């Protein structure tokens, strides 16, 4: 029984790592698209994409609507996009509208603070979950 329990714990602990490696080519391509769009702080934004889509592998999230970043519209409904490219363009416009203005007022703050300030990150829990993903991006993708 202990061996079975150990095997299950091991299996579930390795599943995220397997998903990361399995999707690494797709994750790199997504990062490259984010960077090519001219989005600022692409490593953070890629971390958001990973957070919101479960490493680009979720089945019951906004990804089915090409929504890479968990944007919602009124009524708490997932915003739908025609393509991942359209979603990335939307993020770029969303960031352009907010970030530089915010940065002028808060020059010493980081992107985590920006996300919280504009209401994207709803609390400290989101930041705690996002940080390891951003670190993974910095360590494992070509920036």
Residue ranges and their predicted role:
Residues 1-22:
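Bacterial Sec-dependent N-terminal signal peptides
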Residues 17-143:
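Catalytic cores of secreted/periplasmic lytic hydrolases that degrade extracellular macromolecules
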């Amino acid at each position: 029984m202990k061996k079975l329990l150990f095997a299950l714990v091991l299996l579930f602990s390795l599943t995220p790592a397997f998903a990361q490696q399995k999707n690494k080519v797709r994750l790199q391509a997504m990062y490259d698209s984010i960077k090519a769009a001219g989005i600022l702080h692409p490593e953070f934004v890629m971390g958001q994409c990973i957070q919101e889509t479960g490493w680009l592998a979720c089945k019951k999230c906004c990804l089915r609507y090409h929504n890479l970043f968990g944007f919602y519209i009124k009524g708490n409904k997932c915003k739908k996009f025609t393509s991942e490219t359209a979603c990335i363009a939307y993020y770029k416009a969303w960031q352009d509208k907010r970030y530089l203005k915010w940065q002028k007022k808060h020059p010493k703050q980081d992107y985590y603070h920006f996300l919280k300030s504009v209401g994207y990150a709803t609390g400290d829990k989101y930041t705690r979950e996002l940080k390891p993903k951003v670190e993974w991006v910095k360590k494992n993708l070509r920036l």
